[in-house]
Amino acid sequence: MKKLLTFSILTYLLFTINSNAVNENSSENNAGNEKVLKVGILLPLSGEFEVLGQSFLKAIQLALYDISNENIKIYPKDSKGNALGAYESAKILEENGIKIVIGPIFHESLKRLNEINNITFISLTNKNKNIPKNAIAFGINIDSQIAVLKKYFNEIEITKTLLLSPNSEFTKQSKYVKDKDVLNFYRTYTYDTNPKKITAEIEKITKYRERKKDLERRIKILEKSDLYKHKQELKKLEQMHTLGTVNFDSVFVIDFGERLKSVLTSFMFSDVSNAKVKFFTINQWFDETFFNENAMQNLHFPSIDFNNLKKFNKKFSNTFNEKPNEVSLLSYDALGLIYYCWFNNNFQFKTEQLYNKKGFRGLHGQFLIENNQSKQKLNIYKVSEKKFIKVY
């Protein structure tokens, strides 16, 4: 098995790469500008998404501090959270001789960046379609999530998975997952985004009313019997809400937040137990509000290295006295990746180094850059008694 290249992010790891080389070349590094690593930063630093952009920028500053190399210079520019703002700021970076840029965050901001020459953009988007040739989608994409779910599905031997998705902004993503059909879905459904309508739709999918009527019919029959075994059965049935089983063994829901909670709660109200049917969703970035919902128990989702995320969050909070946006961990890793490539190429950055076939390891886990996207090796976690438990 090929050994992963490890770009070192934490301070103690950075010095294990080649601390002697740093000391021996420190005077040489300061001698010429060619030894300086210039990194452009393209984030929304004003407007609606300013808080998000500032969180990403602080994560990069934290990585810069951990690397502790004065020959790395960052050049933050405001993308304004849109394509025009990103293009105009990228032109300025281009004029200043910047070759590598972290950002932008949003897929929409990439639209005009193919007009920029001689710059590679490490975008934090998780959308990996229609990526410009000079950009890399570094976010936690759906392909990486599906890949690890497929392996886990095979291991636990589930064969009848329902695909559920809302009629919303996730329509394209849901269609992509359905059409690719890596998970071999048993049936697919869409549901209304109105929480009041979701329950009725889930009842229909699970045949709740039919199972409820089956129970009522069986109870009426048993009530007419004086047999001991029928009386015992009646006692059990009176504690139940439906009779019979559903015709699926797992459910994969492409959704987030309150709407995801509504869907899973509707399954619970439809008498579909999460102890018997396994529920899955996409990466949720360890949303702790799930702990407060009984319906979210045993919910499974793919994600990054949780232990490293907790370490990052703690260090960020201690440094800046505020909580980070969890996704900002990727911008921290992006600077570590760029530094690793520069450091290990005689202090020169070449874009082709990012496509090393042996892959890399960051705080978010192992990954390989291929076809203008990062392919991550993710884990599977489940919600269990106010904890996120790694199961795969």
Report the location of each language-model feature.
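Extracytosolic ligand-binding ectodomains
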Residues: 4-392
